[in-house]
């Protein structure tokens, strides 16, 4: 892949990658680090990328970087230090409750939900990104929606 094409694709996906990273890591600094490190790794391996799956490939790399950062955090916590936590930015109560409900989901349910409804990935793209069958993605999305709905007295509409 040419450097101009890679730069364009990275630029087009950067905000979505950041939002996903932030939803996993909950701090701006770590989310920025994950995206930057992920794009650097992608740049180094850009020749191996298949153009038809570039978005899923980039997303998977950044998710892996988020996991690396989480592992580093765990080591810090085990050594007795507490990681810096971001203060909630949402000022509206409903948004804060929704974010809390989504954040409380296990990662295997939270990531597909965020990719589907925040980043507008198709179920097929999510399956490619996560390396699971489409039926698994559908099941996880269903379970995630049910879990979020259970946090509220009234039904939440995602679409």
Residue ranges of model-derived segments:
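A short pre-motif secondary-structure segment
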Residues: 112-116
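DNA-recognition helix of helix-turn-helix
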Residues: 63, 130-154
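Acidic, proline/glycine-rich intrinsically disordered inter-domain spacer in sigma factors
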Residues: 73-103
